[in-house]
């Protein structure tokens, strides 16, 4: 047990993001980590596999948090017993996204689905040219930051900026 999770680093969350790591950590591995390392208190689950997420939810130790790492799957995960989200979209549209999450936490999933439906196109746009380019482009479109990015990142395209300007105006996302 000579690992970072057993050397007193405090509570940690495991990140399950196959899109970044190129491999998927199985539900069984997640559950073994949850049982064997008590300071791993939860997982940011972005496998895109709702059945895998359900196996984790059904078999997790008491107190182990399962947080969505995929904004578009958050309400489905919470509906199944998930605990919340570590969100990209909340960086660009915090009030609107939190409205969806707070409705879901109260069990008002139909209302949460409707609220997210008004946000879905903008959330999808955040990932059109990759993260964090989409978030930065959305914030620049609202006049909150400048469009300049540090290498190796590049500014969002003119098409993406135009798309955000339209969506921000249409859905009152400022």
Model-derived features with residue positions:
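Ligand/cofactor pocket segment of small-molecule handling proteins
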Residues: 11-78
């Amino acid at each position: 047990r000579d690992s970072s999770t057993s050397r007193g680093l405090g509570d940690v969350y495991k990140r399950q993001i196959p899109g970044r790591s190129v491999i998927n950590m199985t539900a069984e591995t997640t559950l073994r980590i949850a049982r064997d390392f008590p300071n791993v208190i939860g997982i940011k689950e972005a496998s895109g596999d709702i059945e895998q997420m359900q196996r984790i939810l059904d078999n997790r130790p008491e107190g182990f948090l399962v947080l969505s790492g995929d904004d578009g799957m958050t309400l489905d995960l919470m509906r199944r017993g998930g605990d919340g989200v570590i969100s990209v979209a909340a960086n660009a549209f915090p009030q609107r996204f939190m409205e969806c999450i707070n409705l879901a936490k109260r069990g008002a999933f139909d209302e949460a689905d409707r609220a997210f439906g008004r946000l879905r196109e903008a959330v999808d746009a955040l990932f059109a040219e990759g993260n964090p380019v989409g978030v930065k482009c959305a914030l620049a479109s609202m006049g909150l930051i400048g469009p300049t990015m540090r290498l190796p990142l590049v500014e969002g395209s003119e098409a993406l900026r135009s798309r955000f300007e339209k969506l921000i105006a249409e859905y009152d996302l400022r």
